[in-house]
Amino acid sequence: IFLILFFFLFLLVGLSLYAQQNCFISSYVRGNFYNRGRISAESLRASDDLIFLNVRPNKDGSLSFENPRIFENGKGVTSWEELIKSVRADVKGTKTKLRLGAASGEWKAMVADEAARVAFAKNIKKILEKNKLDGIDLDFEWAETEKEYEDYSLAILKMREVLGDKYVFSVSLHPVCYKISKEAIAAVDFISYQCYGPSPVRFPMEKYCSDIQMALAYG
C-alpha cells in the first residue's frame, strides 16, 4: 500500500510540476493604469511576460509612442522609457520577460507596403536593442479581407527575418481574426488568443470552447 501511495504522490507532484512548467502568463502593461496604482508589484512579479503596449505603427513603418499626457501623477513615471525602467525595478530578481507591444495606428497601410514592412521591423529592432527588451508582441485588430491577412502574414515573416531568433515574438489573434498564413504561424514563438470567458452572460462555455477549437483546427 505504501508503494502504491508513494507512486501516486510522485505522479501527482510530477504532473503539478509539468503543469507549472507549461503555463506561461503574459500581461499587458499600460502607462495610465500603472501610474494610477492599478497594477501591483505582486501582479507584475507573478507574470512570466510583461508587454508594454506603447507603440503604434505609422503607414511608412515609422513608430508613434504612447501620448505623454497619460503619464501624470501617481508613481511619477513621465514617459514610456521611464515606465520600462520602473517596471524593471519592480520585477528585479525574477525571470519575467519585458517586451514591447505594437497595436492600432496605421497598421493596415503599413503591412500593405513592402518597404514599410521592412522599415517597421527594423525600427522595432532598434527599440528592443536600445531598451534591452526581450521581444515584441503584435496586437493588430483586425484583418478583415484575404488581402489584409496576406499582408499581415508578410509583415510577421519580415519581423522574424529582421529579428532573427534572439527575441521572443508573438502575435495576438481573435476568434473573428485568426487566419494568418501557416508560414506566419510557424514564424512566431507563440500566439495569444483573445477568446474571453467562459462567462454565463456574454461568453457561455459552449462558445468559449468552440472558439478555441476553431482556431486549433485551423492550425
Model regions and ranges:
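Glycan-recognition patch characteristic of GH18 chitinases/ENGases
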Residues: 20-123, 198-214
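Loop/turn elements at helix/coil->beta-strand transitions in domains of secreted/extracellular proteins
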Residues: 20-25, 45-49, 91-97, 131-136, ...
